[in-house]
Amino acid sequence: MSTESALSYAALILADSEIEISSEKLLTLTNAANVPVENIWADIFAKALDGQNLKDLLVNFSAGAAAPAGVAGGVAGGEAGEAEAEKEEEEAKEESDDDMGFGLFD
């Protein structure tokens, strides 16, 4: 098990038990699990997590940026919509015809 993983799990155990996260407590847990961790790594993790509520971080995470919204207003005529569709089809054909010679099996 890597040092980072062991310290992360130890921090989660402490947070779940509602115990303050400190470098000594992180080292105690990792030593109990027979995972060798240098003191500096425990200090870094303890300082990074100081004042953080891990339960809130785990529960209230964001999955990333929202997808862009579609066009709200539609085109008022059928001809304009057809022209745009044809234009998109032409662009797709042009892109597919571009052979730069970088094929996988060339």
From Swiss-Prot:
It is found in: Cytoplasm. The modification Phosphoserine is found at residue 96. InterPro entries: P1/P2_N_sf (IPR038716), Ribosomal_P1/P2 (IPR027534). N-terminally acetylated by acetyltransferase NatA. Disulfide bonds: none annotated. The modification N-acetylserine is found at residue 2. GO terms for molecular function: protein kinase activator activity; ribonucleoprotein complex binding; structural constituent of ribosome. GO terms for cellular component: cytosolic large ribosomal subunit. Residues 73-106 are annotated as: Disordered. Its main location: cytoplasm. Residues 81-100 have a biased composition (Acidic residues). One of its GO terms (biological process) is translational elongation. Component of the ribosome, a large ribonucleoprotein complex responsible for the synthesis of proteins in the cell. The small ribosomal subunit (SSU) binds messenger RNAs (mRNAs) and translates the encoded message by selecting cognate aminoacyl-transfer RNA (tRNA) molecules. The large subunit (LSU) contains the ribosomal catalytic site termed the peptidyl transferase center (PTC), which catalyzes the formation of peptide bonds, thereby polymerizing the amino acids delivered by tRNAs into a polypeptide chain. The 4 small acidic ribosomal P-proteins from yeast can be classified into two couples of similar but not identical sequences. Each couple (P1A/P1B and P2A/P2B) is distinctly related to one of the two acidic ribosomal P-proteins P1/P2 present in multicellular organisms. Component of the large ribosomal subunit (LSU). Mature yeast ribosomes consist of a small (40S) and a large (60S) subunit. The 40S small subunit contains 1 molecule of ribosomal RNA (18S rRNA) and 33 different proteins (encoded by 57 genes). The large 60S subunit contains 3 rRNA molecules (25S, 5.8S and 5S rRNA) and 46 different proteins (encoded by 81 genes). The 5 acidic ribosomal P-proteins form the stalk structure of the 60S subunit. They are organized as a pentameric complex in which uL10/P0 interacts with 2 heterodimers, P1A-P2B and P1B-P2A. PANTHER family: 60S ACIDIC RIBOSOMAL PROTEIN P1, LARGE RIBOSOMAL SUBUNIT PROTEIN P1. This is Large ribosomal subunit protein P1A. It comes from Saccharomyces cerevisiae (strain ATCC 204508 / S288c).
